[in-house]
Amino acid sequence: MQFIDQARISTRGGRGGDGIAAFRREKYVPAGGPSGGDGGHGGHVVLEADSNLQTLLDFKYKRLFAADDGKRGGPNKRTGVSGRELVIKVPCGTEVRHLTTGILLGDLIEPGTRLVAAFGGRGGLGNAHYLSNRNRAPEKFTEGRDGEEWPLQLELKLLAEVGIIGLPNAGKSTLIAVLSAARPKIADYPFTTLIPNLGVVRRPSGDGTVFADIPGLIAGAAQGAGLGHDFLRHIERTRLLIHLVDAGSDDPVEDLRVVEQELKAYGHGLVDRPRLLVLNKKELVQESDLPGVLADLENASGRDVSCISAAMGTNLNELLENVWNELGV
């Protein structure tokens, strides 16, 4: 399935039905009064979070969503049928913003959460409303009102508690694959991961925690370089980051600094998010050299650094213990 995490749509509420001018025409009622009914209200357009959806792909080709119009009123003060509500399903974690102003209108996180994206117009009034002592046979009625019409920006931000970050080829996809049932594409070249991968890792209690493998960052990602803003947004909701550094890199300390700089440049509090610094691919470093690499990273970051091999399955239980401790589970 193609992963689409941004979409622009237009929503239009249904137009209200017109009221009508009508008069009672019944036997034995020679001077029947006004009986024009009101128009039905236009239908609303509603966005609803659905846990079965994982992408905004449905909005790639369909951009305009319009609810039904209300029907005109009828004689004998009959109100017209209101337009049906149009419900649009979106993935949980979808933010809804006004396209031109950028104002946040809603954040649909929990399944079933709803947001009215365009209200339908009110129905017009029939002439029965205009009966008065001065005017016993009013002809006046009003037309229905147009529904609202809004241009919207939808942005999907994945609902993962733990985000795995690092430069391309740091081993993020391998780690999420061995910790969970996720099966991301894995190969030995940069940018193998072009979409975020989600995996569920079981806690000691048996409950699941969602991990997200975020596509590799590069220098300038916060300004849009590489995969840039397209995927940095997906770690905004995480409670904890696992920052992987490739032990086989020519300069692990510089790799660390690049990612930290991008987190700082992007903002949204990411650089201050709780983070575990992890040296991966320990099998690529001589045992005698490993303490020096770890010390360099600890001095540069001011953090404790753990050491694993995702490919070999080394020290993964210790890593998970650190994760659960940070999450308080």
Swiss-Prot record:
What is its subcellular localisation? Answer: Cytoplasm
Question: Which residues make up the binding site for Mg(2+)?
Answer: S173, T193
**Organism domain of life:** Bacteria
Q: Which residues form the Obg domain?
A: 1-159
**Residues reported to bind ATP:** 166-173, 191-195, 213-216, 280-283, 309-311
Q: For this UniProt entry, what is the primary localization, expressed as one broad class?
A: cytoplasm
What molecular function does GO assign, one term? Answer: ATP binding
Might you report a single GO cellular component term?
A: cytoplasm
All copies of the OBG-type G domain together span 160-328
Report the cofactors. Answer: Mg(2+)
Q: Name one GO biological process term.
A: ribosome biogenesis
EC number(s) reported in the record: 3.6.5.-
- Which keywords does the record carry? ATP-binding, Cytoplasm, GTP-binding, Hydrolase, Magnesium, Metal-binding, Nucleotide-binding
**Self-association and partners:** Monomer.
Q: Which family does it belong to?
A: Belongs to the TRAFAC class OBG-HflX-like GTPase superfamily. OBG GTPase family.
The task this protein performs is described as: An essential GTPase which binds GTP, GDP and possibly (p)ppGpp with moderate affinity, with high nucleotide exchange rates and a fairly low GTP hydrolysis rate. Plays a role in control of the cell cycle, stress response, ribosome biogenesis and in those bacteria that undergo differentiation, in morphogenesis control.
Q: What is this protein called?
A: GTPase Obg
